[in-house]
């Protein structure tokens, strides 16, 4: 348990930080907007336009997700100050311990809210797609791509995100050539956007009878799911659409009928595919959503590259930039951008990526 002076100092510090968060989050403006949204939803005629009603419902949930924890935090700190003085006046050690525990809870929530301030990008709150592509190197690289796929699926599951494998191309001997995951959840793109880049694996290959050390690469590209409010002009004449039978390492999560869809956007060379549903129509709709999202993100990256073309201090944006090295026989995984290094390689490959992601976000990558 903290000393009394430490409790007072922490309590005062938290109050200052919460006041800063209230201003940053425009809490009073959000509260006013929430009242407007609630009034609109209470109007029975709103359900004549189901789409608008659903949109307002989503906005209400998003506003409440900000306002409710901040109100609870403010009330908790106000009560905590009073309880601290009461515990001291009555020399109640049990109450003092309870106040200390409440301060820990408040500190954890404040740190979480401060961390979320880093999600300032226009699309950070969006769902996202994660594309994984094996590099050159045959079976070893394809096995590495599948390890990365597993890593992100485990990461998503541990954070309560819904992760759907929308496309997978199986490797010739083991692993995968490529895969696409649709990740749905609060700030999915904000969390994962700094994972875009080349991931390098160094290990003694289980596919080499001589047990020699091999270096393999796999590319990860993360892009936000774009809703219909964003205009992305796609000329149908620029599209090449193919159907095929789904196959791959997705097990029961991947459909095995002839309804799989592959769409090639000829001007850009972008290829997207979806094989999750037995309905060809639904797979086509999902593939088009992926294409729109990918075109949007590539345009945003193109603008960013042009803007930063003369600044070598900034990270390169795109597929060619190596971001992390996984040296398994030395039990070392190092992020080459932030310098963060971890020794428990299996834990990371099982989805423990937060240390890398948080450091990258704090560094403004």
Swiss-Prot record:
GO terms for cellular component: cytoplasm. PROSITE patterns: RF_PROK_I. GO terms for molecular function: translation release factor activity, codon specific. InterPro entries: PCRF, Pep_chain_release_fac_I, Pep_chain_release_fac_I_sf, PrfB. Coiled coil: none annotated. It is found in: Cytoplasm. Gene3D superfamilies: 3.30.160.20, 3.30.70.1660, Release factor (1.20.58.410). SUPFAM superfamilies: Release factor. The keyword Cytoplasm applies. The keyword ATP-binding does not apply. Its main location: cytoplasm. Disulfide bonds: none annotated. Methylated by PrmC. Methylation increases the termination efficiency of RF2. Keywords: Cytoplasm, Methylation, Protein biosynthesis. Peptide chain release factor 2 directs the termination of translation in response to the peptide chain termination codons UGA and UAA. HAMAP family: Rel_fac_2 (MF_00094). PANTHER family: CLASS I PEPTIDE CHAIN RELEASE FACTOR, PEPTIDE CHAIN RELEASE FACTOR 2. This is Peptide chain release factor 2.
